[in-house]
């Protein structure tokens, strides 16, 4: 496992060789050279950092709060002192704060994100909530975690893994840093499985969200990318297979709101 801090590129899966000779990756539905993607995707998250709740409200019709509560309830954080969790792509603290509160403020959560703007928002919120003593903020790469193996009791990632360029590497790193008996949980937008709901959600996603995003934040492009990135993410069964391939056991998932989002679980046994 790498011990160096790197830069993660929040884009989709590797695609093909580009004209410049570098590999191409998906940026939403667009193919971009790997040398361009870092700036493109980081710019998206710099833009939305201070309006992250608005973004999630638009993407989920407000349901992300319920899904996050369910994620932490399924995790069931321990109330014993010394229990540790790593929240990846968790810059603004939504999951970490819930974990600390659910543990009776016993848990210590490390919040890792590649984007400094997102981490800055998280620090401000943590101070206001009086949770800063239970948290550590780390700017680093999900594919090259700067931690020793067998360091954490739990690993969580919510609405972040679809933006990692090499999902298999991120999953492998998750497995490495978890202690034996540790839990992996991933909440992510997924494939809608209800015939009527999928059409309604597509209409909302591709037509309404970018327009509303532009009205509220003056930025339609960032919201278009975020919608497109959801469609590029593997289906529930395919992602579960990737988790198993990384070494996790007892892999399972739960659909939320007809599959608009899915919560995946795995154990390092």
Swiss-Prot record:
UniProt EC number: 2.1.1.163, 2.1.1.201
UniProt keyword NAD present: no
Recorded GO MF terms: 2-methoxy-6-polyprenyl-1,4-benzoquinol methyltransferase activity; demethylmenaquinone methyltransferase activity
Alphabetized UniProt keyword annotations: Menaquinone biosynthesis, Methyltransferase, S-adenosyl-L-methionine, Transferase, Ubiquinone biosynthesis
InterPro entries: SAM-dependent_MTases_sf, UbiE/COQ5_MeTrFase, UbiE/COQ5_MeTrFase_CS
Keyword Protease: no
Binding site for S-adenosyl-L-methionine: 92, 113, 141-142
Top-level taxon of origin: Bacteria
Gene Ontology biological process: aerobic respiration; menaquinone biosynthetic process; methylation
This protein's pathway: Quinol/quinone metabolism; menaquinone biosynthesis; menaquinol from 1,4-dihydroxy-2-naphthoate: step 2/2; Cofactor biosynthesis; ubiquinone biosynthesis
Catalytic activity: a 2-demethylmenaquinol + S-adenosyl-L-methionine = a menaquinol + S-adenosyl-L-homocysteine + H(+); a 2-methoxy-6-(all-trans-polyprenyl)benzene-1,4-diol + S-adenosyl-L-methionine = a 5-methoxy-2-methyl-3-(all-trans-polyprenyl)benzene-1,4-diol + S-adenosyl-L-homocysteine + H(+)
Family as reported in the entry's similarity comment: Belongs to the class I-like SAM-binding methyltransferase superfamily. MenG/UbiE family.
Record's function text: Methyltransferase required for the conversion of demethylmenaquinol (DMKH2) to menaquinol (MKH2) and the conversion of 2-polyprenyl-6-methoxy-1,4-benzoquinol (DDMQH2) to 2-polyprenyl-3-methyl-6-methoxy-1,4-benzoquinol (DMQH2).
Protein name: Ubiquinone/menaquinone biosynthesis C-methyltransferase UbiE
Organism lineage string: Bacteria, Pseudomonadati, Pseudomonadota, Alphaproteobacteria, Hyphomicrobiales
């Amino acid at each position: 496992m790498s011990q160096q801090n790197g830069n993660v590129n929040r884009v989709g899966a590797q695609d093909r060789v580009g004209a410049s000779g570098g590999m191409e990756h998906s940026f939403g539905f667009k193919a971009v050279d790997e040398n361009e993607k870092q700036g493109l995707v980081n710019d998206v998250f710099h833009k939305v950092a201070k309006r992250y709740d608005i973004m999630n409200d638009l993407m989920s019709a407000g349901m992300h709060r319920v899904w996050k509560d369910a994620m932490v309830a399924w995790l069931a954080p321990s109330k014993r002192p010394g229990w540790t969790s790593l929240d990846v792509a968790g810059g603004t603290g939504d999951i970490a704060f819930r974990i600390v509160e659910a543990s009776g403020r016993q848990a210590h959560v490390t919040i890792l994100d590649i984007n400094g703007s997102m981490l800055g928002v998280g620090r401000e919120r943590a101070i206001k909530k009086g949770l800063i003593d239970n948290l550590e903020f780390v700017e680093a790469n999900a594919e090259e975690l700067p931690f020793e193996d067998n360091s954490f009791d739990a690993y969580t990632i919510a609405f972040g893994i679809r933006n990692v360029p090499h999902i298999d590497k991120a999953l492998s790193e998750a497995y490495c840093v978890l202690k034996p008996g540790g839990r992996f949980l991933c909440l992510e937008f997924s494939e809608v499985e209800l015939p009527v709901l999928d059409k309604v959600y597509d209409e909302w996603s591709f037509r309404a969200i970018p327009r509303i995003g532009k009205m509220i934040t003056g930025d339609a492009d960032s919201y278009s990318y975020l919608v497109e990135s959801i469609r590029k993410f593997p289906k529930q069964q395919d992602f579960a297979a990737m988790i198993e391939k990384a070494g996790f056991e007892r892999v399972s998932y739960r659909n939320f709101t007809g599959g608009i989002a899915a919560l995946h679980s795995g154990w390092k046994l």
